[in-house]
Amino acid sequence: GCVLEDRTGTRILIDYGLAPTRPPKYPSESPPVEHAIITHSHIDHIGMAPWLVGHHGTTLHGTELTAAVSEMMWRDTYKVSSIEGYPLPWDMRDLDVALDAWKTHNFGEWFNVGEWRLRFHRAGHIPGAAMIEIETPELRLLWGGDMDTRISPNVGGAKAIECDILCIESTYGGREHPDRKEEEARLVSRVQEVVSRGGVALIPAFASGRCQDILRILYEAAPHLEVHFDGMGTRVTQHWLNNQQYIRDPNGLEKMWRWARKVRSKSDRKKALGADVIVTTSG
């Protein structure tokens, strides 16, 4: 999380997450803020938002899809915390209050916070992820959040926005990325190699973003494979299907969804053992 403030007294917090390690790592305590911008629904960006709302009555601003998926992520975080015995700074009462704290905005739609005008732009990270453009009386700032300018199977890339100040993450800033299409072909080749020798390719992947990308790649390159889809990613995908305005190719996503065999019961899980590929949530 990061607090932005200027001399007009306008103040916002951008994201407030936790690191899902064992035990989890929590951020410094946020000062009181009336408004928080949530760029997307990964737990390292939303994990502490229920605490924020419960303690400060903060309004959460995000896209409709981010708000929908966040509820699922929060409930899963609470469940895992209870099972593993790690303390969580917020409880179910905070979560319930947070669900009513959302104000959702479309891409390109201006809204006001204090003396500032703000609007979201597509970040290209996962569907619903946003960059935030902030127009103050003195300057224009763009907060990139987690962004990607490349086109991926389910979301278009971020576009350049003119600004005076650009705040951008640098996680992969010093790395040379391999060509995405080459990596996709390498994944399909390795999967087919495993299947050809009678094995089952088990692919663990993040529930929001990576699972769906992998399934789209396999569907488009090797539709003859029997692929089973398990874990929380199935529920995330349902939210995507209900918010198709954030999807690059909704028709392609629907076709993949019908093609993949969803694991919804113990008997489905037994059947999956005979599949060619199992794509499931990490852990």
Model regions and ranges:
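Hard-cation-handling environments
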Residues: 188-283
